[in-house]
UniProtKB/Swiss-Prot annotation:
Gene3D superfamilies noted in UniProt: 3.30.70.240, Elongation factor 4, C-terminal domain, Elongation Factor G (Translational Gtpase), domain 3, P-loop containing nucleotide triphosphate hydrolases, Translation factors
GO biological process, one term: positive regulation of translation
Miscellaneous comment in the UniProt entry for this protein: This protein may be expected to contain an N-terminal transit peptide but none has been predicted.
Family (UniProt): Belongs to the TRAFAC class translation factor GTPase superfamily. Classic translation factor GTPase family. LepA subfamily.
Major location category of this protein: mitochondrion
Name used for this protein in its record: Translation factor GUF1, mitochondrial
Species per Swiss-Prot/TrEMBL record: Candida dubliniensis (strain CD36 / ATCC MYA-646 / CBS 7987 / NCPF 3949 / NRRL Y-17841) (Yeast)
Gene Ontology molecular functions: GTP binding; GTPase activity; mitochondrial ribosome binding
Pfam families: EFG_C, GTP_EFTU, GTP_EFTU_D2, LepA_C
Topology in the lipid bilayer: Peripheral membrane protein
EC number of the protein: 3.6.5.-
Matching PROSITE patterns: G_TR_1 (PS00301), G_TR_2 (PS51722)
Residue ranges constituting the tr-type G domain according to the UniProt record: 57-237
Length: 654
């Protein structure tokens, strides 16, 4: 039982308990009064006592499966309000910590929040794990699902089932999660609840009678969700009496306390001062702080089996925080097996990154390193370009991941950065049996090395698209033009079609989603997953200016696209070059063979303007001398290309 708090003590953070629980506990204080009256120590002690009294059978860990913009963050806010974690009307999108998450309406980093709920009879401890929905962040999604017993399958009543919903459903289903269908945005005039229920039944084989129709915006029927979670989602399978095993779900870098890790305690307890051991790096750490997210970091003296909580391990190098790693208590780890699911993230998209101003490299290098600390899935190594100077070769999980990283760099550090055209990891198989993965187009075998190669392999993805019936022809044409191969077509209800195509990853990263949105007037949705490597006729194309290859503009393409792409490149690059005193040739070359060419005519000075009209021999002599001089300049002259030309070309400023 809580002691009546002394007046005058001010609690500086967080809501304590829901009004429902306060009433059930016969306390007369509201949440706001508790904030004022309970000191920080009393608050923490009361919080720990309440957690300790809740049996693991009353824990529920769940996530929300949804397509982008189907209302996941808004629904999370309503659930937090309902359980007293935040005040009604407080800031929206509580779980979206990054600016880019709020602005784009996407979740990039996995987050969690703890909630207390009392049904009038007993207490429950709920952990809502907010996961990214986009395939680029699928590693974080699968790790988050591993800490959950179930999920809310959120579907927009006006849009129905979308591609991301389908992909994340199958991921959650494959991991054994219990799914509760939620139909959101029923307050819209365009809402079609019956159609959404039919789609849920036909696409996911879920009982439409289990659907809960809500409006996260207005709060209509949201109160039905948590009782359904308690009834349908199982409690975590764990044992507080066993030795400690904790799964690392996510991590981030805090400038004041260092690395903060989000962990799922599978067995045992963890407390401040405990020495823990990493299963994969074999390094030990002294735990500086443990606690729950309520909704922000709220320290407690312990966290126990079943909880999804945070720890501050005193880790000096954030690169040691391997998502999916298992942590044990030092000295009690013998014969313990690591938890399944650890896998190093594999970048699928690579870009060259260079500061817009070369003088800023050193300052930007520090900023780049700091940002990478928060995202272990980004690979980073320095590289040098003849055209753009010092820079970095960055590896990302996908094109959205690359775009988000660039935006975070600009918003959080004010840095201006140039990204080269995205490329994918190609596999080269040599005649001697050696295999090599190439991530930089400049390293792709050229004409001299071509004869040592047995075959070239390029990665493919299985793209899942949902489109309205009237645009199916446009989408099929788009996929065909991008070397796609149809695998499946399924007609959903309410005029929607589900298409599955296998498409080269290189085509996907070249704004395929933008083109898909364009040919469907914005109504299509897309998700994808890796589909392995295939043998392919791919070639290295170099853009040469007066015979000099421009390494920053080298690309790898399919031979069938060589002529069209070469023509596009030389025509566009010509716009950004200034006139010279001699003729300049811009060529696209494949294995030293020119596939496209543009010419910039030489500046011409009128050397005959002072001659008399009748002096024909002198006139011809001067023209001949000028012609010979330009020929010599072309042979020995060097074209100076301003950095702005590369920037404009790579940014596609047409």
């Amino acid at each position: 039982m809580l002691l009546r708090p002394k007046s005058g003590n001010i609690l500086k953070y967080g809501h304590f308990l829901s009004k429902r629980w306060l009433t059930a506990s016969k306390l007369l204080y509201s949440v706001e009064e508790m904030k004022i009256k309970i000191s920080q120590d009393q608050y923490r002690k009361a919080l720990e006592e309440r957690i300790d009294k809740i049996p693991i059978e009353n824990y529920r860990n769940f996530s929300i499966v949804a397509h982008v913009d189907h209302g996941k963050s808004t629904l999370s806010d309503r659930l937090l309000e309902m359980t007293g974690v935040i005040k009604p009307g407080s800031k929206s999108q509580v779980l979206d910590k990054l600016d880019v998450e709020r602005e784009r309406g996407i979740t990039v980093k996995a987050q969690t929040v703890s909630m207390f709920y009392n049904d009038g009879k007993q207490d429950y401890l709920l952990h809502l794990v907010d996961t990214p929905g986009h395939v680029d962040f699928r590693a974080e999604v699968s790790r988050s699902y591993a800490s959950c017993g179930g999920a809310l399958l959120l579907v927009d009543a006006s849009q129905g089932v979308q591609a991301q919903t389908v992909a994340n459903f199958y991921l959650a289903y494959s991991m054994g999660l219990k799914l509760i269908p939620i139909i959101n945005k029923i307050d819209l005039d365009s809402a079609n609840i019956a159609g959404a229920k039919e789609q849920i039944e036909t696409t996911f084989e879920l009982d439409p009678n289990d659907c809960i129709a809500v409006s996260a915006k207005t709060g209509l029927n949201v109160e039905q969700i948590i009782p359904s979670v308690i009834k349908n989602i199982p409690s975590p399978v764990c044992d507080v009496n066993k030795p400690l095993r904790a799964l690392l779900v996510d991590s981030w870098h805090d400038p004041y306390v260092g690395v903060v890790m989000l962990v799922h305690i599978v067995d045992g307890k963890m407390k401040k001062g405990m020495k823990i051991l990493s299963a994969h790096t074999n390094r030990t750490y002294d735990v500086k702080e443990v606690g729950i997210m309520y909704p922000d970091r709220t320290p407690t003296s312990f966290i126990k089996a079943g909880q999804v909580a945070y720890i501050i391990p005193g880790m000096k190098n954030p690169r040691e925080a391997l998502v999916g790693d298992t942590f044990y208590q030092m000295g009690k780890h013998e014969d313990l097996e690591p938890l399944p699911g650890f896998e190093e993230p594999k970048p699928m998209v690579f870009v060259g990154a260079f500061p817009a101003d070369g003088k800023e490299f050193n300052a930007m290098d520090d900023q780049m390193q700091n940002l990478v600390l928060n995202d272990r899935s980004v690979t980073l190594e320095q590289e040098t370009s003849n055209a753009l100077g010092l820079g970095w070769r960055l590896g990302f999980l996908g094109s959205l991941h690359a775009s988000v990283f660039k935006e975070r760099l600009e918003k959080e550090y004010g840095a201006k950065i140039i990204l080269t055209a995205p490329t994918v990891p190609y596999k080269i198989i040599y005649k001697n049996g050696e295999e090599k993965i190439v991530t930089n187009p400049d390293d792709f075998p050229d004409n001299q090395k071509h004869y040592d190669v047995e075959s070239y392999m390029e990665p493919y993805v299985e793209a899942i698209m949902t489109v309205p019936n009237e645009y199916i022809g446009n989408v099929m044409t788009l996929c065909l033009n991008n070397r796609g191969e149809q695998k499946e077509i399924e007609y959903l209800t309410t005029g929607q079609v589900l298409l599955k195509y296998e498409i080269p990853t290189s085509q996907l990263v070249e704004d395929f989603f933008g083109k898909l949105k364009g040919c469907t007037k914005g109504y299509a949705s897309l998700d994808y997953e890796e589909a392995g490597y295939r043998k392919s006729d791919i070639v290295k194309m170099q853009l040469c200016v007066n015979g000099e290859p421009q390494d920053a503009l080298t690309t790898v393409i399919h031979r069938s696209q060589a002529q069209a792409r070469g023509k596009e490149y030389v025509t566009r690059f010509k716009k950004y070059l200034s006139y010279q005193l001699f003729e300049v040739a811009i060529q696209a070359k494949i294995n030293n063979k020119v596939v496209a060419r543009e010419t910039i005519k030489a500046k011409r000075k009128d050397v005959t303007q002072r001659l008399h009209a009748a002096d024909i021999s002198r006139y011809k002599k001067l023209l001949e001398r000028q012609k010979e001089g330009k020929k010599q300049m072309k042979l020995s002259g060097k074209v100076t290309i301003k950095n702005d030309a590369y920037q404009a070309f790579l940014r596609r400023e047409d």
